[in-house]
């Protein structure tokens, strides 16, 4: 579904990580074991990294330019 360096959007809030739905991130690693998941780095409006954590495919959507 996604590959490394794809720009993605969080589909839901992750308050424990200070991420809100609609926040933009970049896939930095793809996992297949034990489940398909993606390590995503999220940034703020100025481009500063905010959080990095793994998400399941249904928690992300592609960012449309």
List PLM regions with ranges:
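Basic/aromatic-rich interaction segments and small domains that mediate binding to polyanionic partners
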Residues: 2-64
